[in-house]
Amino acid sequence: GELFVMDDGWFGNKYPRNGGNSSLGDWEVCKEKLPEGIEGLLASARKHHIKFGIWIEPEMSNTKSELFEKHPDWILKIDNRPLSTGRGKTQVVLDLTNPKVQDFVFGVVDNLMANYPEISYMKWDDNCSLLDYGSSYLPKNKQSHLYIEYNRGLQKVLQRIRAKYPELVMQLCAGGGAR
């Protein structure tokens, strides 16, 4: 059957996603852009007998986001050095070695599925390589294991999603082979 995918730009209220430099991490529907919310899109999909999918990039944040304002310690960074950024000169990578961050990332999918169970597909993007090899969560003697622990954290999140939503089709993509 046919599938409509709502791509990047559907989220962010304090910082509406109007380009690549804000709002990653603020996974709330932008009321200005979608006054009927995702519910309106789902109703249209039902009317036209097509499935609905949605784009997310839950491993990332922007320095211009509510998430970054609330949890700057959730970002991969090296102490006493300027923060490296990716797309839009504001994109940063969340620290998936941290169980609280793993819970947040799982929660992105879980909240969408709880609120919109008709979602049949998620495009999980990853448009930023790990830029700063430093974790405020890992102890000093484990910093050299950052990439391994990051991927273990990602696998834990994906296993939780698959266990709870076995029918959800997910496409994990990585711009430029970032993963």
Model-derived features: positions:
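Acidic/aromatic-lined carbohydrate-recognition and catalytic surfaces
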Residues: F11-E69, A163
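Active-site neighborhood of glycoside hydrolase catalytic domains
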Residues: C30-H48, E69-R179
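Catalytic domains of carbohydrate-active enzymes, especially glycoside hydrolases
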Residues: G1-F11
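A cross-family glycoside hydrolase active-site/sugar-binding cleft signature
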Residues: V5-D7, G53-E57, K123-D125, Q171-C173
